[in-house]
Design a protein with these regions (language model features):
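Metallocofactor- and cofactor-centric catalytic cores in central/energy metabolism, strongly enriched
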Residues: 2-153, 159-163, 167-170, 181-277, ...
């Protein structure tokens, strides 16, 4: 009966409706996928599984994923899975916040020094103050070893920034992190941390990275301090005698230019899958470059040409 009613619809509307069930053949090699396809059929769960099945087909055909990550994914060891995706050739490019970028490096340096507190939501105010007094820094369930990470690499960054200042050249934010690996200035805390550091794997496999909003990170804050050259009556008392030039960092418009070029060079033959974890600028930035290409560079051209 339902099929007869559907046939009465206009073709365009009929094309939006699918019979229940998926064209999926279970495999002994994919027990998790088998379970999800069998149990998650409707609403958000069903849409998520459908997206995953589409993404697998896309990658099986040689397509790449543009991976955008917000929040504290690197602090929570997203590198374990993202690094594997990079090595498998699934990732085309990555857009991340400044905090996610540096946290991947910190996991590389001192993963063994992180600590876990599962019931953080039950902490009292006094307990939180006690953590702060002894120097513990926490993001929800995870304590971050600042002394073993940030302070360990700070002098390397200061030297790189001063070096760029002398030569009159700039690097994009992530390229300074890549320099640490290229020059072998840092070593992993443990051998297995190399495998699980997505930043290191991205450098190793020449994966382009885009970092909008680099200021929102610990090292970004530190650079803001060392480059401050203002005259505020309070802040000027604490500024450096010789502030680092802000021009040693390629600002976000440089990232925008590079991403526009990357899109043009990497979407000619095959489509690009967009996978976003979390909200905010890490996902908004790579998305906004698409209409930027259409409406700014191709302003005045037909919609057909813009879409092409």
């Amino acid at each position: 009966m339902l099929t007869k009613k559907i046939r009465k619809l206009p073709l365009a509307l009929r094309a939006k409706i699918f019979p229940e069930g998926r064209n999926y053949v279970p495999s002994l090699k994919t027990p998790v996928s088998n379970f999800l396809v069998h149990t998650k059929r409707h609403c958000n769960g069903g849409r998520t599984v459908d997206a995953g099945l589409w993404l697998k087909k896309h990658c099986d055909k040689g397509g790449k994923i543009f991976f955008a990550m917000a929040g504290a994914g690197s602090s929570f060891e997203i590198g374990v899975s993202l690094s594997e995706m990079i090595r498998a050739g699934k990732i085309g490019a990555i857009s991340v916040t400044g905090a996610n970028l540096e946290e991947s490096l910190y996991r590389y340096l001192s993963n063994k020094d992180y600590a876990y507190i599962p019931h953080y939501d039950e902490l009292t105010r006094q307990e939180e103050k006690t953590f702060d007094r002894v120097g513990l820094r926490r993001i929800t369930t995870t304590f971050l070893p600042e002394e073993e990470t940030v302070r360990k690499v700070l002098n390397h960054f200061l030297k790189l920034w001063r070096e760029a200042e002398k030569t009159g050249k700039y690097l994009l934010w992530h390229e300074y992190f890549f320099e640490l690996f290229r020059r072998k200035l840092v070593k992993p805390g443990r051998p297995e941390d190399v495998k699980n550091c997505w930043l290191y794997q991205a450098w190793l496999h020449n994966i382009p990275i885009f970092v909008p909003g680099v200021e929102d990170s610990t090292m970004g804050n530190i650079f803001g301090y060392f480059s401050y050259d203002g005259v505020h009556p309070f802040l000027k008392k604490y500024k450096q005698k010789n502030p680092i030039s802000v021009n040693v960092i390629g600002h976000s418009f440089r990232y925008m230019h590079r991403l526009a070029e990357w899109y043009m060079d990497n979407t000619k033959k095959k489509g690009l899958a967009f996978l976003e974890l979390g909200g905010g600028i890490s996902g908004d930035f790579p998305i906004c470059v698409v209409p930027h290409l259409k409406k700014d560079y191709l302003d005045g051209h037909s919609i057909k040409i813009q879409e092409k």
